[in-house]
């Protein structure tokens, strides 16, 4: 009955060790993941259980809850602590509930989540912040807690990819590391303290990730931002998108671009498992005067893609996963008119996952990239090492 077991073992061993035959150019040779960016936010108001459920239905492997805290210490899923653009807060509460705060060095007057209790937040309903998207679901869906998102994700067998929003700001409101400690304890209770958990914790700041590296084995991802892309294709670094804000607050000079140098990646590898760079960091582009997206204007989004910048390859050499963002059906660019083709290009370069507002398009992009016949066999063998903890 078991006479073929030795042969199968040899085949799996051979597949694992035959690097040229890897199914994908990802770090582990495994299929890249599709992350529902704020859920299926291209279709439904972002950061709602309904948006997350649709992302799961469309085939997303992970859903992304951005996290802020209420005044009574509950995590809720919002892209920013400011509630104005993504909820109907102005129709429920008067202007006297607005406050003026410094957020990443920018004076901001708004309705801040951390001045509302969870009970008050639960009276709000989400709205679609992008005017070009379907507004018919405005006012229908609640603002979910992290606990509610976890229950949904676990019930559907998908992972979560939470982002800690504005840790320096949150420390000023709640105290040093309260934000991080609460997240770690919540995730440990739900998933255990293990790198095998279907969870990634991400942040644009660095100090919070370094702190959490000492508190958890759950995988951590360093996000890398920029303000824009310059006319020559270089990255524009303008505050507040020039540096991680914890570095600004500490008087440091390290920029986001510095994080992607060889030295920067080596440093990240000491406290995180991956990087999350904005997608223009990954592609070299050339201006050649062609209107590739057909909008009648020749601009930065029409630049011809001219290969990799080497960031993906360098990150993989440092043992770091690469998850890039954000792909949108209604805002493709950087040399591509077709959003699925854009994602396919990044997938072929070797990114380990993509964030998209339209998870169905992401799933289609992954399916469209050819795989060798050995993929299923390699998946069986490589799955044994897929969840290893890389940082040290």
Stretches with model-predicted labels:
Residues 8-9, 42-43, 380:
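Intrinsically disordered, low-complexity segments enriched in polar/charged small residues
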